[in-house]
Amino acid sequence: MNQGRIWTVVSPTVGLPLLLGSVAAIAFAVHFAVLENTSWVAAFMNGKSVAAAPAPAAPAAPAKK
């Protein structure tokens, strides 16, 4: 581990909770942003089905010569 000397500066009893807490806070912020900025995620999480996207139209057959 090339970053092992960090524990000579910061005690693991302080550093690990800070690291894990910051990861949890970032994950919460990302999930909150997704829920606030999309309309379908909240509906999906509440059990509503999402309408399927329409299939693209088939390409036209080439004309015979």
UniProtKB/Swiss-Prot annotation:
Cellular component aspect of the GO annotation: organelle inner membrane; plasma membrane; plasma membrane light-harvesting complex
Protein's cellular compartments: Cell inner membrane
InterPro entries referenced in this protein's UniProt entry, alphabetically: Antenna_a/b, Antenna_alpha, Antenna_alpha_CS, Light-harvesting_complex
Entry keyword set: Antenna complex, Bacteriochlorophyll, Cell inner membrane, Cell membrane, Chlorophyll, Chromophore, Light-harvesting polypeptide, Magnesium, Membrane, Metal-binding, Transmembrane, Transmembrane helix
Record topological domains on the Cytoplasmic side: 1-11
GO molecular function, one term: bacteriochlorophyll binding
Entry keyword annotation includes Transmembrane: yes
Its membrane topology: Single-pass type II membrane protein
Family note: Belongs to the antenna complex alpha subunit family.
Listed name of the protein: Light-harvesting protein B-800-850 alpha chain C
Organism: Rhodopseudomonas palustris
